[in-house]
């Protein structure tokens, strides 16, 4: 269902000559906040926006709790997308065919609470409901398990997680498990560190490349950790930051195994230190895993606190040309989308 479209040219933000990325803002006209979540190899960008007075908190950036409307940005034109019968739609990813994934919220006569469903919105304009087993139920408690698809590749494989959420949408808790959906079947995806140490929990798959490489997060050894899985090879890593030790969220991966993410994790305060790392497999020495080399991502500008710091920046989607989309927070605590292109 296409509700409206606007044409808008992306204007690059002025940046220093030494900047690693050139940024352009993404703002849906009339919205109070905009988040860009996915980009495909054709340059189509998807995400969601809010028109109410609602701001996502930094400790809950992965899954939105505000009343969202989905959008697609194609050739400078914004198109609103709402799943039929829904009053909230969040688009989280897009593949090269233009198939979309995300979740929506609706009312059902047999349920007194709002009901959440994952979905695939095919480029043929057919919507398929996508619910991990056990999540397609009427919420009966203050925390319901919902299906959150984060990405889809050209083969039609979808990845995501099962997340706990307040049925009223006012708060969000940890993920419980990651999953991969292929040819109509869900498979659980919960990788653990070498040696399978005790205490692992709270998985989610957050990205998939056209070559089938997976990105995700888990909580283990006292920290949120990012991971990459390519076949039987698994890498686990954390991002260094001055504000906290090691909590790390990975949000996307492309066919070259370039990865993106930010510091922090679910219900863990994030300073908004975005990061990019080139082909993570090149970090291996004689098949021994080593810490990736990170390039910091920060939307141009600075905070108005003392001492001033970079604007909080959250990369969420990456394509094979290293085009990156995400969200930044301005000095008025408002969220905006962005498109970043590398200068290397």
Model-identified regions with their sequence ranges:
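Bacterial N-terminal signal peptides that target proteins for export
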Residues: 1-6
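Cleavable N-terminal signal peptides
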Residues: 7, 17-18
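Residue-level hotspots at or immediately adjacent to binding/recognition sites across diverse folds
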Residues: 19-344
């Amino acid at each position: 269902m296409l509700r409206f479209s606007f044409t808008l040219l992306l204007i690059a933000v002025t940046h220093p000559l030494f900047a690693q990325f050139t940024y352009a803002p993404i703002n849906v006209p009339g919205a109070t906040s905009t988040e860009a979540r996915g980009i495909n190899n054709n340059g189509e960008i998807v995400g969601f926006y809010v028109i109410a007075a609602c701001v996502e908190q930094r400790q809950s950036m992965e899954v939105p709790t505000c009343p969202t409307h989905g959008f697609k940005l194609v050739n400078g034109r914004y198109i609103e997308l709402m799943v039929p019968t829904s009053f909230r739609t969040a688009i989280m990813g897009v593949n090269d065919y233009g198939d979309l994934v995300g979740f929506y919220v609706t009312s059902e006569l047999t349920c007194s609470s709002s009901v959440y469903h994952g979905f695939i919105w095919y480029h043929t304009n057919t919507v398929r409901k996508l619910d991990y087993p056990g999540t397609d139920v009427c919420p009966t408690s203050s925390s319901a398990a919902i299906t959150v698809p984060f990405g889809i590749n050209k083969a039609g494989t979808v990845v995501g997680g099962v997340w706990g959420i307040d049925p009223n949408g006012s708060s969000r808790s940890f993920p419980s498990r990651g999953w991969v959906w292929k040819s109509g079947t869900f498979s659980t995806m919960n990788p653990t560190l070498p040696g399978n140490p005790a205490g692992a929990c709270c998985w989610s798959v957050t990205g998939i490349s056209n070559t089938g490489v997976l990105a995700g997060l888990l909580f283990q050894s006292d920290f949120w950790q990012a991971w990459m899985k390519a076949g039987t090879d698994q890498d686990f890593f954390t991002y260094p930051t001055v504000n906290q030790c090691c909590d790390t969220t990975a949000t996307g991966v492309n066919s070259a195994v370039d990865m993106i993410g930010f510091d922090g994790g679910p219900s863990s305060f994030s300073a908004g230190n975005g990061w990019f790392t080139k082909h993570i497999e090149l970090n291996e020495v004689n098949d021994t895993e080593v810490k990736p080399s990170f390039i910091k991502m920060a939307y141009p500008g600075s905070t108005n606190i003392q001492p001033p710091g970079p604007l909080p920046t959250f990369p969420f989607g990456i394509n094979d040309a290293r085009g990156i989309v995400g969200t930044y927070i301005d000095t008025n605590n408002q969220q905006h989308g962005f498109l970043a292109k590398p200068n290397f």
